[in-house]
Amino acid sequence: MRRILAGALAAAVVVACAEKQRVGKAPDAAAGADASPSQDKAGSAAGMASADGGTQPSAANAPKGAPGMSSADAARSGTELSGPAASGTATSGMAASGTATSGMAASAHPPAAATAAPTVTRTAGGVGLLALPVNDKAIVNLELRFRSGAVDDPAGKAGLTYLAARMMLKGGTKALDSKALLNALFPLAAVLDVRVDKELTTFVARVHKDNLEKLLPILRDVVLSPRWDPAEFKRLREEAVNDVEKRLRQGDDENLGKESLWSLLYTNHPYGRLTLGHVTDLKSMSIEDVRAQAARVFTADRLVVGLAGGYPAQLGEQLAQAFSALPQKSAAEGPVAQAHPRGPRFLLVEKITDSTAISLGMPWALSHKDPDFAAMTIARSAFGEHRQFNGRLMQRLREARGLNYGDYAYIEHFEQDGGDAATAQTGRARHQQEFSIWLRPVQNENRLFALRAALRELQRSVKDEAFTEEEVGQTKGFLDGYLLLFDQTDSRRLGYALDDAFYGMNGFIGTLRAQIHEVSTEQVNAAWRKWVDPARMQVVMVGPDMAEVKKAILAGTPSPMHYQKDAQGNASPKPKALTDVDDVVQALPLGAQGDADVSVVPVEKMFE
């Protein structure tokens, strides 16, 4: 009954949130820690009322890019993958503030039929074009999606693609220096961003159609005629170094844990290096390195121009022709290799903190195109939906025990889209993915108990406690409404269409909505057992006294649950059924295979 009520409440919250947006009220601010890993605070932003069919995220609060490996061929064919895709949205110009969106009725709507999305056509100049049908909205959305990213970084130059993209966006053009560029954007109330990920770099432009003709020359110059000013290079390189040294290491324990997990999962793989760059690599880069990288990876044959909203009929062809002035061809792209981690199972990052951030996961090849994706979506939601209470992790770790603020699971790389939206960013499509669990920070005395509790829930979900008919039915009802929020805006519809093109498929969201209704409980459990292997989960913890934690892990020392106490030092009584489970959890074997399987690293060494 509790699960049904929790699911109903979650679905009601989704509906209420959509209705609140429909009548034009501003959304509540999201908790900062839920925003995607490296958020770019440097971009300037001003309010813009969006007619994009939904609330647009603030450019200044959008997340950043990604870096990672040796030359283009080697990068995509090389070793293993993982990564710090966390950081990747550099922003310039104005951010949207949000306006009305259409309402949503949860389960009352029939499932959306799978609809064929537009396909990419190659123009004479080699540039791809993907245009959603023109509508009567006042906002025009443009995306320049390059099949280039952190995997294209040469060895010893982690962060080069990200820095090149930031130089293009924020370093000025031949016609406008950086200050003049900002001044030109301000009165247009436009968004101009870039997001760098492992395999993709996306320049995003969004503007009212009345200002489109003023924005287009700026966008063209940003991509075709960067200024490459040595002073701007020095400034932006220093920003990137500070982002790693100060923001990530010192001020963002949760995303430090996530980034560290991705580097662990993709040991010796092009995904395994921080997209933002490693400090020593960044400091070694020259402006000549950046210019050469831009010419090598931002080429016409790797570009798809995406359009959505109320754009002029000839805009796509005009942009494709303009951007055919890019270098025509780059080195052929090789396939991204499968990820096979060779690192320790436990990475313990030593840092003086009041609580411990925990992330755990394993790499796999599950993608949107896989026949199991709908079943895995249901299982993942039932196990730990992002920022919702209808999953086992939230009910049993937070609700029953009060361990922390939230506990979530993901079946693909996830970075939140910003604002109060709990949806994932688009533009993060990859040939390799990962399963991960994110435990929000816990009290240091409870960190090993929390880890054991999460691992026990995962083990039981694939063996002793399969998802029930009730859980699957309730989760389907929740997703029936929740998935309607995923593509409410033109910008998100365009993002998904471009992601579909990456995977070689059409209509992912519509197909997923339809398939959710067809999957049986048996199929959900079979897919979950097929893909999830608790023994392969690797663990990152960020907190103090990690040498002692290592000893406890290797010795198998029990870690009892410490419940919160009142002012008199008394803990509220707990049901015997719960404390009996606690007794089992505290002694759960963690599976360390010896000293080399547990690595302790000072925070100053991470991404150095």
Predicted regions and their residues:
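Scaffold signal of the M16-like zinc-metallopeptidase fold and its non-catalytic homologs
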Residues: 172, 215, 247-299, 322, ...
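Acidic/histidine-enriched segments that form metal/cofactor-coordinating
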Residues: 52, 181-293, 338-343, 452-456, ...
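An aromatic/glycine/proline-enriched structural segment found at the starts
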Residues: 267, 299-300, 304-366, 385, ...
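M16/MPP (pitrilysin/insulinase) zinc-metallopeptidase core fold and M16-derived inactive scaffolds
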Residues: 143-206, 272-276, 387-416
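C-terminal motif of bacterial Sec signal peptides marking the signal peptidase cleavage site
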Residues: 14-16
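Bacterial signal peptide processing site
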Residues: 18-20
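Post-signal peptide N-terminal segment of mature Sec-exported envelope proteins
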Residues: 22-94, 98, 102-112
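Buried hydrophobic packing residues in well-ordered domains
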Residues: 126, 144, 162-164, 185, ...
